[in-house]
Amino acid sequence: MPQHDQLHRYLFENFAVRGELVTVSETLQQILENHDYPQPVKNVLAELLVATSLLTATLKFDGDITVQLQGDGPMNLAVINGNNNQQMRGVARVQGEIPENADLKTLVGNGYVVITITPSEGERYQGVVGLEGDTLAACLEDYFMRSEQLPTRLFIRTGDVDGKPAAGGMLLQVMPAQNAQQDDFDHLATLTETIKTEELLTLPANEVLWRLYHEEEVTVYDPQDVEFKCTCSRERCADALKTLPDEEVDSILTEDGEIDMHCDYCGNHYLFNAMDIAEIRNNASPADPQVH
């Protein structure tokens, strides 16, 4: 069995091409567990999680990344937040009926893929590409050609392992400032495209790579763990409350006795009573009643 929730980087010795392979199960399950999403929405979040992991490793930056789908369809938003440590969280918003076998365009409608990179140091960058491809992988390949001018191929698979949702993916990309031959890149992409879902989700990464590239010289680097991690906190909720008009906050307190702030990503609730609000307004730290 593979070591799930890991990202593996690899390099072809005789071609100016790099690759990545990632599988996720526990991370994906934690993203999905607090929601009752229709199956097509689960599949899109799984693909988005895999894609975000692969993109994060490719871009090689310190900071946060957000990859989101947004449009006018019944699933008008799906988003994965991550960082260079491969710590991920995600959520989707459903506002209409989802057909059982809905594809990406049926779910999102007229929409975009928005990639936002927020480095720990330096300027924030945002790239937007229209949802013109039939798959998320095709849209992101288009993004790389437009923004990075780097030929890139993504191969994303979703399924179940032992009855639980899992997903995996592979990425090939021409090395920056290298002159890889198109025929060589196409040859490697053709090999990679033969990967079966069952192989990717159930075999160790080294075996997958050997099956695909056993006639090539491949250097595989140490893997990086992928995990679910939510960045919500009581302090962040308090900061958000500071941005609301006092009248609005007081109205909620009068009506409900407390303010319940819910994190859509992890399901945590943060409760604030009148005393907490007074402390926030006085710039003190409120007590910590948090319920899961």
UniProtKB/Swiss-Prot annotation:
CDD domains per record: Hsp33
Cystine pairings recorded for this chain: 230-232, 263-266
Example of a GO MF term: protein folding chaperone
A Pfam family this chain is assigned to: HSP33
Gene Ontology, cellular component aspect: cytoplasm
Family that this chain belongs to: Belongs to the HSP33 family.
Subcellular location: Cytoplasm
Post-translational modification: Under oxidizing conditions two disulfide bonds are formed involving the reactive cysteines. Under reducing conditions zinc is bound to the reactive cysteines and the protein is inactive.
Function: Redox regulated molecular chaperone. Protects both thermally unfolding and oxidatively damaged proteins from irreversible aggregation. Plays an important role in the bacterial defense system toward oxidative stress.
Keyword Lipid biosynthesis: no
UniProt keywords, alphabetically: Chaperone, Cytoplasm, Disulfide bond, Redox-active center, Stress response, Zinc
Provenance organism: Escherichia coli O17:K52:H18 (strain UMN026 / ExPEC)
GO biological process annotation, one example: protein refolding
InterPro entries reported for this sequence: Heat_shock_Hsp33, Heat_shock_Hsp33_C, Heat_shock_Hsp33_N, Hsp33_helix_hairpin_bin_dom_sf
Protein name: 33 kDa chaperonin
